[in-house]
Amino acid sequence: MVSPTAEQIPGHKGKVPERFLRQLQEDIAWRRIARGLQRLQVQRTLVDSCGLRQKGAAVLLGYLAQWVDIGFARPALIKQLLARFPSKERETLSLLEYVHLRMAEGLVAMSEEEFGKAIRHFEIVLALEDEIRDKQVISIANFWLGRCLRRQGRYGDALGYVAKAKGLAIQLNYPKMAAVMQVLEGWIAFQEGQPEGAARILGEAEEVLAETDDYVTRGNISSAYGRIARRQGNYDQALSRFGKAIEEYGKRDPFNRYLARSFVNIAFVKRLLGLQLRNKIDVEAARFRKKRTRTATTSFPKLQGREQLKRLREEAFEHLTKAREIYDRYDDHRGKGNVYITYGYLYLDNGDLDRASSVGATAFSLGEEKKDSILKGRSRILQCAVECAKFEEQIEEGSSGSSSQLACEYAREAVEFVRQTQNRRLIAKAHIALGLALCLDFSDGVEAARQCTDDAIAFLQPLSHDYVWRELQELKRKLRGAGNINSTLREWSQGIVGSKSFQRVSEEFAAIVIPKVWRREGCKVARVAARLSISPKKVRRILRNQGLLTGSENG
């Protein structure tokens, strides 16, 4: 916070020492973080007195913005100091001072997730590039603009600015500053589906920064390694990398928002580990049920892994709670939205569909506030998955039609939102979600679902066998089932029945039709029997054969 004394003297007379400004610039360029932070604390009175009538104050404010980005103070400090430089009085500033003020304004906009506004500030700075001798600030402007574009999911656009920022840093003989920019370059390579190239780029930056105390950037490197490991299905390695990132971030600030991001990443990995474990438990349970049909006296064993599954879920929720506390401090909409989305998938996995639906809607509203296409797209994908689950489970009477329709609407909106970005993987996920939603009712959606599959495959190249790939396989499996049904009906319409008797054909037809009518009739056996004029006993038998009713259920 700006001290009360400084507030009384916003026009503090005197001059900001050029040596002090040069030291701040050099400490940033050489990533001497602790030294720079200490220097600012020693000169706190000078910082707090920063005002329009103080020579060099605007340049100081520009450097302060860079140090706030590193962790010196909250962006609110820059916002308060900017109020001392009203637009109508800036005509007396030099071009360099004006550029630094624009950088400070861009930093504030960036911290408030107003990325379009921030981009405009940085574009003004870059438009004056030829008139500015201080190329370090031009390098930072390119870098920050690239960061904004990356947050918007415009990876290809971002890469050009990041490359220019790094090139300028190298020309200025600032290899450590260039390495910081290289980390973002590696992250973009990862998002573009180049994990090996990303790891190589990150490794080069890691080597340069290893002897510095730039713990935030070092943490970002570990975090990026964690995401690469997660994408490749190496969940234990991913947890280790995220743990290392948390350790690095904690050396600088226990409430760093990057720290919150790592907590969310760990929670999501533990969710994926939980899904793996649950699938293993389900396989063991199915194997035992099959064995028990041959030995009626065998009691059902206590399956191993249930306690571990419970523990993984509890730990995931604990990590999300920590992340949410940090994001609340910054009012970070994207961060809070990602927390809610991860909550949503944990609720969905556990069958708590009402809570999953609620947090999905909350995440979407956060994205709507900031016009965040990525967050809105992710939220709609979650909401689509919830409606698909409602349809499959038929938890509300007469809900099948509305759930399938809502699922398709959410998925189509997701596709629309994410197509405003260059996030190929997220676009693929949206197409998979739409394909799965269309599979809920095959009356007119088979070809559209097949097109969704083709689109997803195109955007997922090169393929990696992670959870998104498994979702794609699930979509393909459902489409194969639809193809089998359609081909069977087509053959029957042409009189091709092979050696099947009419009774056998009737039974197979009933097995196709009855489950669909049962869903449309709110999962009520009596309604199906009345509508089709058949025995309720036959309806129950067919539903049980397909695993839609247990032995104790009557529908």
Predicted regions mapped to residue ranges:
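Amphipathic alpha-helical segments of tetratricopeptide repeats
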Residues: 44-45, 82-90, 123-130, 163-174, ...
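Residue register of alpha-helical TPR repeats
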Residues: 58-59, 100, 140, 180, ...
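Structural motif corresponding to the intra-repeat A-B loop/turn of tetratricopeptide repeats
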Residues: 72, 112, 132, 152, ...
